Amino acid sequence: MYANEWDIEGIIANRPVAREGENTHRERTGIGIVRSLLRAYGECHPQLVQHDPRYPTMEALLQRTVAGGVGNAAAELVLAALESKDPRPVWFLNWGTDYGSNPSALKLALDQVHDQRGAAEYARLKSRLRLSSDDRFGEHTWDVPPAFPLWVDTFRPEREGGRWYHRFSALTATAGGFDIERDVRTGHGPLGAMYPVNTDRPQKEGDSMTFLYLVPTGMNHPEHPGWGSWGGRYGLREEKGGSRPYYWANVADAWHGTVKRDHVLARWAVALQNDFKARLDWCVAPFEQANHPPLVTVAGEAIRHVKPGERIGLDATATTDPESDALSFEWYVYPEAGSYEGPPVELHSSEPARVVFTAPELDETRELHVVLAVTDAGEPALTRYARLIFRGPQADH
């Protein structure tokens, strides 16, 4: 449902056969399950492109779908992405690679480069990678330099109710009145009907935050895990001494009067589930009968250098909605995402789309983050964001 948001270089089905007792899909091979889902997606594609023409065709995705552990197809798919002339980082999202599955295709690809091409080429290709994944990469994780440039571990640590992986379903399953049968499996086309509740863990959602971290909502920045996103917010793994850019779910947010790790995800739960609901509607409804997210625009630069005591005005009056729905504007300081530790900054507003505040004392090492959440009055109500970052005056060099 989010294939329109990224350029998908490949899909790897890494489990040869579904686990008995856990997944009761009539197709038993991993690659067979993935292909059946893609065929269902293909049936929905004519509707989906009415809502966003960036949705890739079923054929394009099938051409880039391989089974892990079969020859070198999966590793070669990874290497093709790393060797492309496209200068953008390559994000590798890995889940389900544990007991009973094939080794990670990324590990196999890096094994090949390390053993056959030398240290310089290994370092060059590894520098292109960004990871949102559990650790399935063997010696490439900690032992073979250089480090991965950025790694977001959506699995650990265990605290406040278990592994972070296990908190997603608990925090989001019914957020905003979401109902998996009504909103996904019934009346939403062949892809929704295949949503895998046919397991012994209905609505198993621990892996979703792996890619939700990358959904471009206007709030998140993939290179900054500490800023927060629909996948949660992450902190640097301290016991490694900061030697490697490894982030995990060890941080907490203040929300509704308490401070908890769960809040880094719970605060967005209704918005992300409503977004999923809307996309299932897109599978069956024409553009004019479905809702689409607002287009948030704040005048000026997203990152600004300000002087202490300076009066700052923020203007989002250029924000629009595809259906011309009424819009609500919520402005707030996000203290945990920034590094400013001084007195609270108060935002003042005489109209919903504008706020003013007085810049606090900031230096080059401190940031103040202000987030704007805009929600439309459609069904389901959809939310998008803008993040404004304020830093102290630039030093003269």
Question: Where are the predicted features?
Answer:
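Extracellular and select intracellular beta-sandwich modules with Ser/Thr-enriched
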Residues: 381-387
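Surface-exposed, flexible coil segments in extracellular/virion-facing regions
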Residues: 332-358
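Extracellular interdomain linker/stem segments of modular secreted and single-pass surface proteins
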Residues: 391-397
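Short, surface-exposed loop/turn segments at beta-strand-coil junctions that are enriched for proline
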Residues: 358-364
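N-terminal acidic, glycine/proline-rich low-complexity segments
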Residues: 1-313, 319-341, 365
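Exposed beta-strand face motif in extracellular beta-rich ectodomains
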Residues: 364-370
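Short, solvent-exposed loop/turn segments at the edges of extracellular beta-sandwich modules
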Residues: 374-381
